[in-house]
Amino acid sequence: MEIRRRPPNPSIKVANLEYAIPHPDSKPKNILEEIVWEKHLEVEIARKKVSLEDLKKKIKDLPKTKNFIDALRNSNSKPALISEIKKASPSRGIIREDFDAKMIGKMYQEGGANCISVLTDKKFFQGGFDVLVEVRKEIIIPILCKDFILYPYQLYQARAAGADAALLIAAILTDSDLKYLSKVAEHLGLTILVEVHDSEELERVLNINVFNLIGINNRNLKSFKTDLEVTKKLAKNYANQIKENSITLVSESGLFNREDLDLVKSYGADAVLVGESLMSQEDILGGVKKLVGNL
């Protein structure tokens, strides 16, 4: 699935006036492309407000990052649990009206989650780096910054906000992008969770051979439907390479109960990322405890 970067609009001058001409490909082809195009603008605005140098200065005063992978590998419950904080999504709209990120983070931690994922995308998920900052103040377990990262600047934003790990999505990045961003992340002490949706993306990531934490997203990017068979297929077909490279495998999306977790564990998943099903529950604390087998 090709995700294009936003094409620039050409312009013409008439007298002393300049007019923008709509580009023939100026409309995104799908929701993921729309998010990527919007992200370009979001980052441009952020750079004008806070310079890279300012982020670097802030990072210097921060403590060392927590080991995200160790937190998953050392989990007493299997598969390990990454609980996600998100207020909204393109497929669901508002997921939780009474959204208190700090309280949700504390309930996740108390319930037994090994790590927490925080959505920082503003327009489509109603998140933000300010949300990550607030959650970081309340919890001690590792935090993943989940966003549509295109530029090194965003990794600096994540680190400055208190993240220990960051998401890279193979579908929106070239091999060169993945390699370069992974080096920047390593420099910042951030663990990278690289996300794939199909065999083509997984092969790309395995061939790059720098990632030891891979997420398989069970959500179809075109239909937005979820199917746990995606984890089954990819984990089985690439089991040898995953084992040989000591890769920790995370199953993402479409997971609602303990039975789902046990199923993807049997497919080869070492950890799961669960968001919407927890955010939708009245009793979040009880929901987490059920997933990790403490209730």
Curated annotation (Swiss-Prot):
* UniProt GO molecular function: indole-3-glycerol-phosphate synthase activity; phosphoribosylanthranilate isomerase activity
Question: Looking at the record's lineage, which domain of life comes first?
Answer: Bacteria
InterPro entries, per this entry?
Aldolase_TIM (IPR013785), Indole-3-glycerol_P_synth (IPR045186), Indole-3-glycerol_P_synth_dom (IPR013798), Indole-3-GlycerolPSynthase_CS (IPR001468), RibuloseP-bd_barrel (IPR011060)
Task: Provide the reaction this enzyme catalyses.
Answer: 1-(2-carboxyphenylamino)-1-deoxy-D-ribulose 5-phosphate + H(+) = (1S,2R)-1-C-(indol-3-yl)glycerol 3-phosphate + CO2 + H2O
What's its EC? 4.1.1.48
Q: In which pathway does it act?
A: Amino-acid biosynthesis; L-tryptophan biosynthesis; L-tryptophan from chorismate: step 4/5
Single GO biological process annotation from the record:
L-tryptophan biosynthetic process
Record keywords: Amino-acid biosynthesis, Aromatic amino acid biosynthesis, Decarboxylase, Lyase, Tryptophan biosynthesis
Pfam families registered for this protein in UniProt: IGPS (PF00218)
Keyword Lyase part of the UniProt annotation: yes
Please report which protein family the annotation says this sequence is part of.
Belongs to the TrpC family.
> In its UniProt entry, what is this protein called?
Indole-3-glycerol phosphate synthase
Q: What is the native source organism of this protein?
A: Prochlorococcus marinus (strain NATL1A)
